[in-house]
Amino acid sequence: MACGFRRSIASQLSRVLDLPPENLIKSISAVPISRKEEVADFQLSVDSLLENNNDHSRPDIQIQAMRLAEKLKCDTVVSEISTGQGTVNFKINRELLTKTVLQQVIEDGSKYGLKSELFSGLPKKRIVVEFSSPNVAKKFHVGHLRSTIIGNFIANLKEALGHQVTRINYLGDWGMQFGLLGTGFQLFGYEEKLQSSPLQHLFEVYVQVNKEAADDKNVAKSAHEFFQRLELGDMQALALWQKFRDLSIDEYMRIYQRLGVHFDEYSGESFYREKSQEVLKLLDSKGLLQKTLKGTAVVDLSGNGDPSSVCTVMRSDGTSLYATRDLAAAIDRMEKYNFDKMIYVTDKGQKKHFQQVFQILQIMGYDWAERCQHVPFGVVQGMKTRRGDVTFLEDVLNEIRLRMLQNMASIKTTKELENPEETAEQVGLAALIIQDFRGFLLSDYQFSWDRVFQSRGDTGVFLQYTHARLHSLEETFGCGYLNDFNTACLQEPQSVSILQHLLRFDEVLYRSSQDLQPRHIVSYLLTLSHLAAVAHRTLHVRNSPPEVAGARLHLFRAVRSVLANGMKLLGITPVCRM
């Protein structure tokens, strides 16, 4: 990608440096655009060439760059060669740049940037992504929103790159909280409320029974006994648990549909209640299980009895724990999917838990444990609705839709829409996702309702507005101009800046594929939208000569296509009117 320009430059460099072109491809990068000056299209970092050089004298980088530039020649692709601070810079023939980039964007469609030489030679893998994973007995809160949208982004990106992706929602549907919930429902539950609003009612019951159990030992004892009945397979207890689970999943699926998220498998800790006992037996047979004075069973991760480096895998009554069930799930998934990579997306508070799980798998002799990866994220602070603290994710989604509808109604330029509620939801979700994805995933961030709905500046609303405006341009002028175009009509600085930015899309996708951070794509799309806004103001289509109008429509169509591609990877549905 970068339309073959990178490979053409690498071929010339390989002859001078006596290195295979493949070794040079990733050292040649598209230059970020600059508002201050016109920049070259590509640059080679001389420092990157010297990284593997064993010559400790390492001559001055600038001298090396100049010597290399002198050996290179302009050709039909490269029109100018210069040097920068430790770099050799390449300017592409302007008309070739224009024609090739725009043709490539239109021809490749949703695959633009993904066919790049940066990705060539990378094997297609089987990848499992576990994300969202709410606890059935507890509130489906905003932390699960982060896991949901981050996991969805990672799965989207891996799928777009041609990998075979399995999306798993691993529900917290087992454990002591179900002892509390079963007892609590028998004491405080109402069947009508459970049927009409399962997540809300189960949460209310869970809060109430926790208070009772703290004050009344008999309630705590009943809860413990109920969970033991579950573990032993008591039919009556399991029937009540199954009802809680089924009703909750139905409501989750409705919420996921609003988010535009889907899963290939709804799994859960309950699937591994028996297999976790097999894991305990396996640990015991390998001499890894140690009993404590309290009757619990632990695995020593230090190898020398360090009490601070143990992981508890069994309660004193023989019931399993979260870690045990995660071990059983990992082993089962390897048998089922034979994955090359398994990614867990949870908050950073679970970092130690996953370190221990991966370490135990290694100790058990499973070499594939190194293929398991935890992608942690920080906490969202300050996300409250007008009624106060947020309890449920659905409250947030409803608030977003309501506020966006009010915003749209107050703006004079808002178009008449067939389904204003659906548009408001899509724009609102874009606003939420962009605010979340702008920084490092690991960072905590302060949520701001005011900032999230700004139509100007670096927001999701601005991205949606840009996409809708460009779509409107195509609708207004139709596709009659788009049969062919004159490259000489797109040589203004505004056009060239957009073309240079479009060149960089594959590098941005590559960076995000390496570190799984969506911020690279977010930053790229925001810059693209700002460039499009400037071009829209200065490069008029209306009242321009047909040849000029057609060329500009080609440019704006390419921008909209790449903008839509990037938004979809992030989990955003682009709107065509707003």
Swiss-Prot record:
List every position bearing N6-acetyllysine: K568
* UniProt cross-references to InterPro entries, sorted A to Z: aa-tRNA-synth_I_CS, Arg-tRNA-ligase, Arg-tRNA-synth_N_sf, ArgRS_core, DALR_anticod-bd, Rossmann-like_a/b/a_fold, tRNAsynth_Ia_anticodon-bd
- Gene Ontology CC terms: mitochondrial membrane; mitochondrion
Question: What residue stretch is labeled transit peptide in the record?
Answer: 1-16
**Source species, domain of life:** Eukaryota
What Enzyme Commission number does this protein have? 6.1.1.19
UniProt protein name:
Probable arginine--tRNA ligase, mitochondrial
